[in-house]
Design a protein with these regions (language model features):
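Active-site-proximal loop/helix of nucleotide/amide-processing enzymes and allied scaffolds
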Residues: 67, 71-148
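Histidine/lysine/aspartate-rich catalytic loop segments that bind and position anionic ligands
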Residues: 34-88, 92
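Long, charged amphipathic helices and adjacent flexible linkers at domain junctions
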Residues: 13-37
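The DNA-recognition helices of helix-turn-helix-type DNA-binding domains
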Residues: 9-13, 102
Length: 148
């Protein structure tokens, strides 16, 4: 019974932390965005891609799961991302995906898909302002690394 209470308390804390994302949280830095998704994504066993949609003042409108992949890849097409961003009237977006290995170093595939998503964003007028790769308690920001 005590173990169940502890698990429930931990889950409640996790949900309250993620609720912050839905209550007009402002993204000022890559670490702000990472903070929103880190606890939920760091232990996933499969690659998952999330989309953080922002308004003109970089306030979070919504966070949406876009795709769930395998152990080492997440298949995503730019249209899947921008359909959601357009529906939400996003001014800009941040994409985040995890590496189940715990190592957030971007792969060549990560860099290629980021370029495609960025190009699509220019066409539809919704800026991709960052791509975060989430590892175990750490992350890599494409913006900070000059890859965007």
């Amino acid at each position: 019974a005590k173990a169940s209470q502890i698990k429930a308390a931990i889950e409640l804390g996790r949900r309250l932390k993620s609720y912050k994302a839905q209550s007009s949280f402002c993204i000022k830095s890559p670490s702000d965005a990472a903070e929103l998704v880190m606890e939920e994504m760091r232990y996933l066993r499969k690659e998952c891609l999330k989309l953080i949609m922002l308004n003109i003042k970089n306030m979070v409108i919504s966070i949406k799961d876009i795709s769930m992949g395998s152990l080492n890849s997440s298949i995503v097409h730019p249209r899947e991302i921008y359909v959601e961003a357009i529906k939400a009237s996003s001014a800009s977006i941040i994409i985040c995906h995890n590496h189940p290995s715990g190592d957030p170093s971007p792969s060549e595939e990560d860099m290629n898909i980021t370029r495609r998503i960025c190009e699509a964003g220019k066409i539809v007028g919704i800026d991709l302002i960052d791509h975060l790769v989430i590892g175990d308690g750490k992350f890599v920001s494409f913006k900070e690394k000059g890859l965007l």
